[in-house]
Regions:
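Small-residue (G/S/T/A) turn/hinge positions that recur once per unit in extracellular repeat modules
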Residues: 61-63
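Short, flexible, surface-exposed loop segments at domain boundaries
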Residues: 2-55, 69-114
Length: 114
């Protein structure tokens, strides 16, 4: 009985686990932007662009890279800030996301390529 109470108390004091279940990488299109909640709605490329399939949470430490194409087929990769990303991204923007899947099914972005 005492052991059961001790385990219950331990679970209450430690709080909810924040670990990520698995890492995912995929190519998506943006369906909506929720800057206030720091997230974007996504759908797989080729699926209905008006129907959100999942949320991707973008934090200040997320690495965001945008590829800029130059003349002659050359390109330059530019790092973007969090604010720059939310200013740039719109419905229909194509992107590649690498991150961890949270317990609720959403994706916590570690890297985003535009």
């Amino acid at each position: 009985m005492v052991v059961a109470l001790a385990l219950a108390a331990l679970l209450v004091w430690t709080g909810r686990a924040q670990a990520q279940l698995l890492m995912v990488t995929g190519e998506y299109q943006v369906t909506n932007v929720d800057r206030a909640e720091q997230r974007i709605g996504i759908a797989l490329r080729g699926d209905d662009p008006d129907r959100r399939q999942n949320w991707v949470h973008v934090r200040a430490d997320t690495k965001i890279v945008r590829r800029v194409w130059l003349r002659g087929g050359a390109f330059r990769d530019e790092f973007m800030t969090w604010n720059g990303f939310f200013d740039y991204v719109r419905k229909g923007t194509k992107l590649k996301v690498h991150g961890g899947r949270n317990w609720d099914g959403t994706i916590q972005a570690k890297k985003i390529w535009l």
